[in-house]
Structure formats: C-alpha cells, structure tokens
Amino acid sequence: MGSKVSRTQRCAVDVSPLSVAEEKTSCGILVLLVRHVDLRSRALVTFTRGVYSHASLGFEDDPETYYSFAYRGFRIEQADFLVRRTPDAWCRVYRIPCSAEQERRARSIVSSFCGRKESLKYNAIGLVLACLHIPLARRNRFYCSQFVALVLNRACGIGSKRWARACLPDGLSSVRPSELLFDGLAQNLPKAFSSGAKLWKLSPTI
C-alpha cells in the first residue's frame, strides 16, 4: 500500500528552494500521514480515491509529538498512542526543510492554536467540500490536513491559500522539497524512535 499514488499526489506543490545560507542551518517540519482502518476513514479514502485519511504536523526535535484536528476539535497526538490504538495503520512521515525563522513562525502558529484549544472545532463541511475541490475557510474550524496546510502556507509560504483551504491528506505528500522519513505500519514507528535516534537518520530520502 505504501507505493500507491493517488491523483492528488501526481501534482506536486512547488516550494521556493532555500538559499545556501538557509540550507546550512535548515530546520525541519514533520508531516505525519495515516491511513486509519475505521469506517469513517475507509469512506473518506474511497470518496477521495486517496491513500491517507489523517494528517498531523510536528517538529524534528520532537518526532513523537504531533498537532492536528479530529472530530472533537484540535488535539495534541503522541506517536505511541497511534501505535497502541491502530498498530496496523499505514503511515508516512515526511520532513519539510525550512529556515529557523520559518520554523519559529510555524511554532508560533501552533502555540496560538494550543492557547485557544477549547474554542476550536472540526470543519466537517470544509472537508466534504474539499473532496469536491471547493475551498472553505471557517472561523475557528479546521479539518486535519487543512490545519497542516495552513501552517505550512503561513509559516513557509508553501502553496496558496486556496490550496491550503482545500488540501486533503494525500495532497501533503506532494509538497516539495521533502524527505520521506518513514513508510510502513504504525507498529514499526518505535524502532525509528529507539535510543533517541533521529527518525530521518534511519530512513531513506526522496
């Protein structure tokens, strides 16, 4: 399943390359894509003809913590919980290189979401319209990949506002440049985190 490519993946989202100075001190934003096996997730990937049903955002200095939206709103996710809950879920982890300033902006955005967690809701209507390629931004309402794309757009200038508002999980695998750090079952994620090792030092890149 890891080798499947959806229609969304065929069109990469171009990102301006980092300058030489930025490359030397580049940081990284992590994007975790998951194909859950519950009924809702199966319906979503069937309707979108995609591979993944959920997306989260993290940072390379803490590859076990991610931020996203689910049916109950904004949430902070731990990789070990994913492993315990759905060990057979297929996952991919991408690293998107960025400058220190871009990472700082991304952290600031995520921090602002954490600070108003109780007022944030799930954007179910936005997700349905995104499946029809219709972008919809709603105040304090987001779905998982819309949130991730919004952070990447605002912090790093990736894609456009329209792209971010209608981005589905598979669309995040098309962001370039990026490194594929992990591609496999959730139950194998702990091996990548063992002994405090950096995930991207243990996996191939693209």
Can you annotate each of these PLM segments?
Residues 4-9, 124-206:
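Activation targets extended, charge/polar-rich intrinsically disordered C-terminal tails
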Residues 10-54, 177-178, 182-206:
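Donor-binding and catalytic core of enzymes assembling or modifying cell-surface/extracellular glycoconjugates
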Residues 33-97, 127-136:
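Glycine-rich catalytic cores of cysteine/serine-nucleophile enzymes that process amide/ester linkages
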Residues 60-62, 114, 153:
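Generic helix-packing signal
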Residues 100-127:
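A structural motif
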